Amino acid sequence: FTYTPLRNDLYNLDTQQEAHQFEFPYADNTFDVVVLTSVFTHMQPAEVQHYLIQIKRVLKPGGHCLSTFFIMDKNTPEILKQNKDLMQFTFEYDTYYLHDDKVKDANIAFKKIAIQSMANNAHLNIKLLNNGWWKGGDKSASLNYQDLVIFTA
């Protein structure tokens, strides 16, 4: 693990180093497993795309990446609209939604098709997508509060 303070408008305004330009400080084909919990839920699309490319680079062939997202499928906007107790993503953009348009890295939900597109662009496969209970799903059918995605190299 290497701590690197990167700029984020929610957590860290004290640096100019940007996530979309950060090169992971590891050699190619180093890791069997990469884990990101509640990271992509605070990153913009270009940053997530860059990280997925970096993850593909550092994963060994056949390696896995366990990550969490907030994923909006075709039914999610209506589910959220009907239940205001759930986290709301009301600011829609081309491939994602924001919880707060004034703090863009606060909470980000990606459209499901955007996750697939970013995986394809990074030459990763989606092995598993498990819906979290953040959008009112059945807790017993979910592995996590956030949506869980396992990518393979």
Task: Go through each PLM region and give its residues.
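A short glycine-rich, Lys/Arg-flanked "PGG" loop and its adjoining helix->strand segment in the class I
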Residues: 27-28, 49-61
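Local beta-strand N-terminus motif with an aromatic residue
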Residues: 31-32
